[in-house]
């Protein structure tokens, strides 16, 4: 991963002796060409530590590939037989608030993006998308720094943990985690801020982070996710990331985001779900909200039927706070609920918009892969800096797996991971099987008036088989 360390090159040489270790050799090959300098990490080597900070980072990134669940399990792993060290070395590194994890993640991603761009011989015309979404990060330790209760849409109740806001880059073939932030929720009960009593809040671990890199992350904790999403996109553009569409769900689609995207100097558009609420849009017939627009289009008999998606849809160009946008409304069946999409791209057709937006479901698969394979959010440290470190490492590991999968003959991240860890994973499915399941979910959503996207996400989250089927479908479509 750098010129001043031999860990990755030594491992690659070690596995090169056996032709059966193709997967791990591919991972070593990707990591070896990622150039991260020690100065980018933000902390210096400890005098009593035989490894440099860059070598410690390398070893941490290798944990899941050598079936090391956490630092406490390192001494019994095969990796420790090659690079012997004490577990406290890893704890000290992860607890250090001076490590610049956001910059490290971007330093890796920009090199992976460059590798993907230069190594892809067959170019496709699929748009590049930024996808912003969030997921629950449940916790059990009440003394963890900044811990609190959050509302889980999956479980429909408050749980102890963090909300993890993520931003992914997808080109329709593979996706990379670009950025993330951890958030808490103040809650409505002033007597129990963040869902905790005064005694519980006092029992949490606290630390002064002034002057540390993690201070930026602490400041993000109670920041509105909609505002942080804009900051993430700003930073991505600043670092040279280019995209065609920003995909968001109805929680993030608002006037501020529409104005922000439409004012960028690069050519990009917003494509997001909208709530059928009280937001007014300027039309030729005057100001109308979403429900009024639907009634107007029905009255004008402007609704059409799409045979491919088997749904009724209608379209109208309007203005939101002076910004021209196109609205799409669709429903399945006569009694189905209407759903709305908004885009700043006035040239986009309904079918194109639907297909592009469907890519957002890939985030659910990515979350599932990270949680089941890479210990996403499983860090047990009370230090908030260690929580940030753990999430970043997981995303780095996932991005490496995605890059290897793209250029090698692996259909899924799970299949690649299984081969790396000498495990077996039977993956056999066809597009038709997934199509049947998708139809079932859509019909159930229509019959019981449930949001299809949320139902599908919950189905994938709670059912390993459904997750595998969806995973296979995405990658087969991409190929």
Give residue spans per PLM region.
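A short, flexible helix-boundary coil/loop motif
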Residues: 1-52, 66, 78-82, 184, ...
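Active-site-proximal, Lys/Arg-enriched surface segment
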Residues: 18, 42-45, 95-199, 312
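Short, positively charged, Gly/Tyr-enriched micro-motifs
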Residues: 38-114, 171-176, 230-239, 243-250, ...
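Electropositive, glycine- and tryptophan-enriched low-complexity nucleic-acid-binding patches
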Residues: 67, 83, 88-92, 154-243, ...
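Short amphipathic alpha-helical "interface-anchor" segments enriched in bulky aromatics
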Residues: 126, 130-136, 350-381
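A short acidic (Asp/Glu
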Residues: 140-143, 254-263, 279-286
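Acidic, His- and aromatic-enriched active-site or binding-groove loops in soluble protein domains
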Residues: 266-279
